[in-house]
Amino acid sequence: MAATARPARPRAGQLVIIGGAEDKLRHRTILNRFITLAGGPEARILIVSTASSLGEEATDLYAQLFRQLGAAEVVSMRPLIREEANSPRAAELIKDATAVFLTGGNQLRLASVVGGTRLGRAVVDGHRRGLVVAGTSAGASAMASHMVAFGAGGATPKQRMTQMSAGLGLLPGVVIDQHFEQRNRIGRLLALVALSPGLLGIGIDEDTAAVVGHSGVLEVIGKGSVTILDPAKLQTDAYEAKRYRPIMVSGVILHSLPSGYRFDLRRRQLRANLRPVDATDRELAAVNAATERTRRLIRRIAAEGADDTAPERARRRASRSQPLEEASE
C-alpha cells in the first residue's frame, strides 16, 4: 500500500512590529510593506483600535490610508470590554481577513480586553495559519508573549522602573518596547532583560518596523533602528537591588540595526543585510493630499501613550507619605 503524503503544515504569517509614529504622509514605507504582505490589491484588513483613546478618529485615518494604498477591503472593530471581544462576530471577522492591524494607545488596555478572548485566540490561531498581523506603538508591545505594561524612561536601568505583563502571544521569547530612542527607553529594557534573561529585548524606534517571518528572521525597515538586547551572558545584581535603585547589568550583547539589516531571533545571530527600500514617486506624491486636520490627528496618534509613567509617579507620592518598607507588586 502506497504511503500517503502528509499535508504541508501552514506557515505562520508575517509580523510587522512598528515602533509608533510611522510615516503616513510621505514615503509610507512601513504601511506599504504591510499592505503588500497582506495581499496587495486582494488585501482584506481588520483594524482593532481597542488600545486607542481616539476611537473612531484613529480607526478612520488608518482605514483611509489602507484604502489609498490599495487594500480591497477594510473593516474595523473596537471592543472595549471582554464581553465584546468574546462575541462570535469578533472571531468571524478574523476568518475573512488577510491581515490584522493593532493601533497604538494603551497596551495594557488592549491586552486586558482582548487577551484570552475569542478575538485574541482567533488572531493567534489565524497568524499560525498565515494571517499577517501588524501593530504600532502599544499594538507592537502587545504582540509578544511578554509585554511592557508601563514604566519610566531613562538611560539607567533601575529596580521597578517598569512592569511586565502577559501580551497576546504572537511572538514568544521576546519583550518589545516602542518609541525607543525618542522616549529614552534603553534603561527599562535593560532592566527587563536583567530580570528575565531568557527573553530577548527588542526596542523599536519611531517610523521603524521589525518584520518577522515564519523562520524567525527579523528584518528592519523604516527611518530609525531596532535595538536588540541579548542577555545570554548576563551578570546582574537585580535580585539584590532595593526599591528604585540603579541595578548592575553587564555582559548584555547590544545590536543596533538600521534599515536593511536582519537578525535571526532563534539563533540570536546577525544575518546578511538587505538593500534599504526607496520610496516610489507615487508614495512621495501622497503628501500633497494630506489636509491640516489629518496632520493634527497624526500628531495626536503619535503622542498616545507618551505619559506612561503616571503609575510610577503615584506610587512614589504614596511612598513618601508612608514608612519605608518592601512593597509587593
Question: What are these language model-derived features?
Answer:
Residues 107-117:
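Glycine/threonine-rich flexible loop motifs
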Residues 78, 104, 125-127, 172-180:
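Short, structured patches in soluble enzyme cores that scaffold and shape functional sites
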Residues 92-96, 116-130:
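Catalytic-core regions built around general acid/base machinery
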Residues 108-109, 140-143, 227-228:
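Short gly/pro/ser/thr-enriched loop/turn and capping motifs at secondary-structure boundaries
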Residues 46, 52-96, 102, 109:
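Portal/gating segments that form or line small-molecule/metal binding sites
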